[in-house]
Structures are given as structure tokens and as C-alpha cells.
Amino acid sequence: KIVQALSSMPPAARAGKAAVCRLAFCNRDGGVHSGVLNFLPEMGMPMQHIDRIIRSKNVFTAQDGIDTARELAIAIAGDRIVAVGKPDDVIAAAPAATPVLDYGEQFVCPGFHDAHLHFFHTSVGSSPYMLMDMGTSEAALVQHALEFSQDLPDDAWVVTQGWRDYRWDPPEHPTKASLDAAFPDRPCVMYSGDGHTLWLNSRALEALGVTRDSEPPAGGSYDKDASGELTGIAHEAAAMQLLPRCLEWLGEGRIASAYADQMRRMAEQGITSICDMSLMPMPGCDFIRDDVYDKLQTAGRLGIRAHLFPTLLDDQSRLEELQVRYANNALLSAPGFKQFFDGVSSEHTAYLTEPYTNPRFPGDQGRLTVPAERVRKLVLAAAERGHTVRIHVIGDGAIHAALDIFEEAADLYGLPQHGHNTLEHLENLLPEDIDRLRKLNVVASSQPCHITLDPGGPERDLGLERSRIMWPFATYKQRGIRQAFGTDSPITAVTSMNVLYTAITRQDPKSHWPEGGWLPSERIDAATALRNYTLGSAYAAGDEQNLGSLEPGKYADLVVLDQNPLTIDPQELQATKVQATYLAGNLIYER
């Protein structure tokens, strides 16, 4: 791209810009070519200066159409890649004193990009202030929480995240009674593993002002027993509205420390970029803490490239203010909005076109957490102003309705000029909606580790027929649909090798269930999985011009692995270790 820009300039203009040096670069067809490359002053680098060259016999650039790793060298100046090509050519073209880091047979690829997570809860959940625990039963989890609480500050609420009652023995719904017995005087809040339900004790309900007469917000509910008394369970919007207040005691200092620690853990996983997604559909509750990111960057402690997606509201000023603030910020950006549309299948809140196979009441087909007409108006208003939207949709009914809205937006305003609309999770689809994704240029953003999160759950809730069209990664590839991969952390762990392992094998990263993979026809090869986790995620962030592949002009975000995922047995993937991680050309982790 830089060569093309130079070629279009008059000779005098080129000469006036800078002296040129000869470098090799790699074209999209995979061939290595030589060309003239100029270090332009606007890149902020001295003329003919390269900070370092990284070489390896196994470099996977993640470019479309190149599914192999090759022997290449990557020249880096500042935070950008300036050349990729044959090692001898790149080294010969660089100044003699340029450092060359030779990784031998180790595997080099773009830094991993988690396309969907919730960084506040991921960070706090890994801190000393929140217990991450699914528990094996209600009693066991309460006991763990009691032990955990002994080391908490005096002002702390007891907060846990991760419970999944359908995986307990016995699989019973919990109530506040067990929490009240353990914590009669201290607020205790347990946040479910799917992120859509809260389980609270009486002291927490009292502190939050929730009584049996309280009206839940639209799209939410409070469970009650036969006498009308609160059981301590809040669902969807009701849970989401309460959660921020349950965490106010943390304060900015503790949160910033948790963020910095989590960024270091991400670097250990080879993750250099994230899409931090709004967790709540209500104003002021989305947990997108731009103030914390700003504080860390000012202190020189921002160790990740973060794309922020706040909640879509009638007032779009928050996103637009962030876009102005981050216009020239290489590490922070706000590409678009996040919008909720339905819930989750395990709680029967994902919206289906037909009732659940195991209905909890007649006509049980889930529900839209935000009315369709409301979402339509919000998305169309965003499209009119040129903003992209990423919509949480799990059930086939919600997916179909969201595509209808994107189609109307395209008819009225055209496809987005910058970035891409994205559907998040999209677990079970109507067959006819798969091709609509390609037609509307919508990115399918999935979290591979969700596949085995609830063993037997799809068949239990949806039946065999609908379960055959779930997380169809291979079908997406065959139909030419752009995919992005993430974790939805803290719903599943931020473990990069687990993302790749589950996408390739469709087996659980812990139990390795089932043998041969769940819906094995939808397994994908390692090159596709890597591309989805790098270049595909950059598409979801609307930043594929700067991220996602190892090409001249893109940011120098790289990861070095001790094994080649393209050639090893997939069952060995989880033993693969990150050897080094580079962000913006700087080494931020080394094993």
C-alpha cells in the first residue's frame, strides 16, 4: 500500500518526502517481491530506520488464501510492520546494525484478538475481590464463598461468578435461604456463569432496595415463591440493572489494578487486542470503563489494544465522544455500538421461532429482552449516522429479526462505509439465514468454547433437528462468511489455545468430550481457526486495515509459539506455549 502511494506521487514529491531504501515485501498471492518502500515522515520514524527484524522458518501471515507457514522475515519500524519477505532480502535491505531476532522453527503469527469479552468482569473476576467458581452444588458453592469471604476487605460485598445450576448435583435452582444462613449480615451476590442471572441474599436485596413489591425493568424479572416472597433470583435486565451497584465498593484504584494485572495475563496468552463489549442494555450500566483505560494509558500501563463497544442508546453522544477522543490513539478506539436482543438458551430466554423442546410453560419460545421495534429504531438511527452495531443474538428468532433490521438499514443507508455490522453468539440459525450473513456483509462473531459449555444442552432444549445447525464454522467458511472468534470472558476463560482447540476439534478443552467432536462436520482446519482469531476479529472491530495479518503498514502485533498449530496433532494444541508476545513492536511478554 505504501509502495502504491509512493508510485502515485510525482518524482519531485517522492524525492522531497524522503530518501528511499530497497526492501522486500509479501504480496497477497503469497509471492515474495522486491519493491521500493519509503519511511514517510508522517509514520513518525527517522529515514531508513528499522528497530528490529523478526525472522522464523514458520511465519503464518493470516492473509486470506495463504494457509501455510513460510520462512519469512518481518521488519518493524516504530509500531508498524514495514516489510515482510525472504529473510536474506529483508536483512540485506536494512541498516547493518539492525537487530535480528531469529526464532528458528518456532511459529510466528499475528497477535490473537479476542473479538468478544467483558473486560471489567474478566479483570475483577481474576482479582482477589471476586470468586470465580461454578460449584458442584448449591451447598458446596456457598461454603466456598464463605471461605473466600474471610480475606475480603471490611467494605467488600461477597461476590462470586460462574454458577450453573443445571450442572450441579442435584441440578436445583438456588434460593436466598442458603446465602442468608451463611451471610446473615453481609451482602452476598452470586453472578451466574452465563452472565444473565443474579442470586442474592436478603442483606443484598435490602441494600439494593428490592422488595416483593418492586417492579422489574422491562426485559427482566424477579423470581418469587408461592407466597409471593422473593427467592433471591433476578433475571436478565433485572440482574443487569442491579449488578453495577453490587460492585460500587471496588473503587477506581482496585479496578485499575485488576485491569493491569489482566492485561499481563492476556500477553501471556499471546492476546494483543480485545473487543470490550457492553454487558448491560441500560444507560450507565455497560461496564465499558474508558476512564480506567485512560488512567492506565496515562500511567504507561496500558498493555493491550482495546476496541470499546458501549451500549446503543437513543443518545449516541457517548460513542461519538469516544471516537473524537481516540481519533489519534493507536491503542484505544470506539468502533461502534453493542446491542442486546435476547437471552440464553439454558435459561429459555433466547428467542426462538418455535417453542423449546422442553417447554417450562405452554408456548415457551423465549423472549426478546428488548422489543424488536425498539431495536429497529436504535439500529436505523445508528446506521443513519454511519455507526456499526454488534447485536447479541442466540436464538433463531432473534437472529432472523436482527438480519431483517440490518437488511432494512442497508436498503435505507447502504452497507457501513467503515467497519462491519456483526452478530454475536448466533448459536442456532434458520438455514436460510446463513446466506443472508454473506449478502449483508455481516460478521459472524462466535465463541468456540461455548460449543461444549452445556453438554447435552442443545439437544435437551432445542431437539436434534435444530441442534444440527449450531455454531456452523465449516459452513460459514464454505459460504464465504467472515468469522471472528473470542471467549465471551468471563463466561469462558481467556485461554487462547482452548479457543483454537475447540474450534478445530469441537471437543471440550477440559474433558475432551465428545470423541470425534460435537457435530464433527463443522470442524475447521487450523489455518481457518487462526485466521478467525486474528484477521476475522479485526474485521469485527472494523480495523482490518491495521490489524489481523502480518503485512506492511499494519501494526506490529505478533505472537511466537513453540509449536506449529498448522502441522501438529490438534490434541497437542493445548500443550503449545506462548514464547513471546509483541504489541506495537514492543516485547510485552517472554517466556
Please describe what each predicted stretch is:
Residues 7-8, 14:
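Low-acidity, Ser/Thr- and Arg-rich intrinsically disordered low-complexity segments
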Residues 118, 331-349, 442-452:
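Non-cysteine beta-strand/loop elements that form the S-adenosyl-L-methionine
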Residues 299, 323-329, 438-439:
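Acidic (Asp/Glu)-rich catalytic clusters
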Residues 380-390, 397-421, 426, 431-435, ...:
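His/Asp/Glu-enriched, well-ordered alpha-helical/loop segment
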